[in-house]
């Protein structure tokens, strides 16, 4: 019996090693595919080469208030956006809604739900929307308006799965369908997010590696005519806003009554400069929360203003109450966006 049990444990360890190797190999292959876009321009500006920019808008007040240094912290339904491997960090089912008052009267909405199939497996579904009021069309000869209006909007639907391979290592993936509409033009794409979450075993230290919005280039299609009536049938292709994220977090203060979580994250986008995110969250009685975070572009001084980005600092707070039906968590975040003003985010989570 002892020999059989030992063989069983050895076989389980072998399966875990294979799963870990497969997950890391998948992330490595994805990174290699992006190498031509990312590595040669390390630290450079690559603005304007990708579509579906709404996919870069942070979801949920908690993650945003921590400076978006969140891939190694997320453990709720907002993991559907930040890191799908976060879905199995807690044995909780949750419905999550978020609203962002973005710049120029643009509104960003997010709805997500997660459900545990077993203690080690979880699935989730998410819906993202970016919308604004229709705008009047202007031309060189009619600068005050033509009387015709155009609309713009984005929508994304994602399905996620996460599995806890061991007590320390988790892996998750999301498949997302995205559609963007600009007047008579549309762009559609299917993309993938891949994420890992690893507890090091050294206290509360953990790190995460995530690749989001990974997929093929997209090309607009639709009926478009120039001012002289000439139809346009040749459109430029755009890459997806692929983003590689590496995060590390730990709890330097952890007791029965209070907790302090700190996090640092490196973001490596294919359409902008690399940047570092720093964040912190203080929790009292797991009921009241205070959060803060900053973003700095690589090459900028940490404690000085970032001269290359409108994003600066983030602040936020939240509270949690338990009802007969569920536990409700309400969060708020403020993000300073330089000359564009401040952004306000609100989110609610219903945990069952």
Predicted region positions:
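Sec/Tat signal peptide C-region and signal peptidase I cleavage site
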Residues: 30-36
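Subset of outer-membrane beta-barrel
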Residues: 37-352
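Bacterial N-terminal signal peptides
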Residues: 19-30
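Short intrinsically disordered, low-complexity coil segments enriched in acidic
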Residues: 1-3, 22, 113
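N-terminal secretory signal peptides that target proteins for export/translocation
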Residues: 1-16
């Amino acid at each position: 019996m002892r020999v059989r049990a030992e063989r069983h444990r050895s076989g389980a360890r072998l399966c875990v090693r294979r799963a870990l190797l497969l997950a890391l190999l998948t992330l490595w292959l994805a990174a290699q595919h992006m190498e031509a876009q990312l590595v040669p321009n390390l630290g450079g500006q690559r603005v304007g080469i990708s579509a579906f920019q709404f996919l870069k808008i942070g979801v949920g007040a908690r993650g945003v208030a921590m400076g978006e240094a969140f891939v190694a912290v997320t453990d709720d339904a907002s993991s559907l956006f930040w890191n799908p491997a976060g879905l199995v960090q807690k044995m909780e089912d949750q419905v999550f809604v978020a609203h962002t008052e973005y710049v120029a009267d643009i509104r960003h909405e997010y709805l997500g739900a997660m459900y545990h199939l077993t203690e080690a497996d979880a699935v989730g579904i998410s819906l993202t929307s970016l919308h604004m009021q229709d705008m009047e069309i202007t031309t060189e000869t009619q600068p005050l308006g033509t009387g015709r209006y155009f609309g713009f909007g984005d929508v994304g639907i994602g399905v996620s799965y996460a599995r806890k391979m061991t007590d320390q290592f988790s892996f998750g993936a999301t498949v997302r369908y995205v559609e963007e509409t600009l007047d008579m033009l549309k762009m559609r794409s299917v993309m993938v997010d891949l994420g890992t979450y690893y507890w090091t075993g050294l206290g509360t230290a953990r790190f995460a590696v995530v690749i989001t919005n990974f997929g093929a280039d997209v090309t607009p299609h639709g009926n478009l005519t120039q001012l002289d009536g000439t139809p346009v049938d040749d459109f430029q292709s755009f890459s997806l806003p692929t983003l590689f994220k590496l995060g590390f977090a730990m709890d330097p203060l952890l007791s029965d009554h209070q907790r302090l979580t700190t996090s640092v994250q490196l973001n490596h986008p294919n359409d902008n400069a690399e940047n570092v995110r720093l964040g912190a969250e203080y929790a009292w009685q797991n009921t009241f929360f205070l959060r803060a975070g900053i973003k700095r572009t690589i090459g900028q001084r940490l404690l000085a203003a970032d001269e290359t980005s409108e994003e600066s600092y983030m602040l936020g707070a939240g509270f949690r109450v338990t009802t007969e039906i569920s536990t409700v968590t309400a969060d708020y975040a403020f993000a300073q966006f330089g000359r564009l003003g401040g952004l306000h985010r609100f989110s609610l989570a219903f945990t069952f």
